[in-house]
């Protein structure tokens, strides 16, 4: 059974689909890099999976009894208190529901703080942005999530911290879905690629470098297919302007087909950087 199921997810802003009936599965142990141009909705998708954003339609379902944790891109401005308290707070719900004892929460918090190379007694406000990110990662991991969602995890980190994070995530046994602009980090951590492009969420069962090759081939094929479609549409537009032939009963099917082609062309979302052809 899949760890996470996305079923016909749709979300639009100002009439533009960020997600258009997206359906995908995440299996345990996968480390998925989520790619897409700026503004395509990658962070929105992570927030949707985390339960912080409602879709217009469709569902995100985490397998029964499984947990997900989300590390946002920016450090919250209201984050305060000692490192130990900030991390332990993530376990407060489990303690209140009797899932774990208070002493267990304390032990778990201390263990993950030590693993992150942090000082439990330091006030988080005195830390650098990179160290604050480590605290937030510790808070995300202390709940022992089955699925970890990371939005730009290398932001504000120095090279040493990035190398540490890469090694940690590469050896971590959980499942990972993350967004990053750091291609080196992506190459070393991801074993699968998801891409969000013009509302479509595609899955590529390969690492990043192989994805680049396959994606280039797919875009080339798309361009050729669109060029053939546009040529055929232009020919049909010339035909319809002839007038009398199009009004004959036996040509009604051809007229309907032309109307359908016009609609398909109108709805096409061009590759980023491509101009829309008006006919």
Predicted features along the sequence, with ranges:
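ABC ATP-binding cassette signature C-motif
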Residues: 1-226
